[in-house]
From Swiss-Prot:
Localization (cell): Cell inner membrane
Main location: membrane
GO cellular component, one term: plasma membrane
Similarity remark: Belongs to the MgrB family.
Keywords recorded for this protein, A-Z: Cell inner membrane, Cell membrane, Membrane, Transmembrane, Transmembrane helix
Gene: mgrB
Role noted for this protein: PhoP-regulated transcription is redox-sensitive, being activated when the periplasm becomes more reducing. MgrB acts between DsbA/DsbB and PhoP/PhoQ in this pathway. Represses PhoP/PhoQ signaling, possibly by binding to the periplasmic domain of PhoQ, altering its activity and that of downstream effector PhoP.
Tagged with keyword Cell inner membrane: yes
Pfam families linked: MgrB (PF13998)
Protein source organism: Cronobacter sakazakii (strain ATCC BAA-894) (Enterobacter sakazakii)
Protein name: PhoP/PhoQ regulator MgrB
Length: 47
């Protein structure tokens, strides 16, 4: 039962990470000044 709980936790974390990446991509496309530094780093990480 404990393994099942860990699997759910991991799935939620992965989903949140994917959502965050989508949000970053949208912000980068709109060229928001605050996100420009993050976008530069984001380009070097192969998502």
């Amino acid at each position: 039962m404990k393994k099942f709980r860990w699997a759910i936790l991991l799935a939620v974390l992965v989903a949140c990470l994917l959502l965050w990446m989508q949000t970053l991509n949208v912000m980068c496309d709109q060229d928001v000044q605050f996100f420009s530094g993050i976008c530069t780093i984001n380009k070097f990480i192969p998502w």
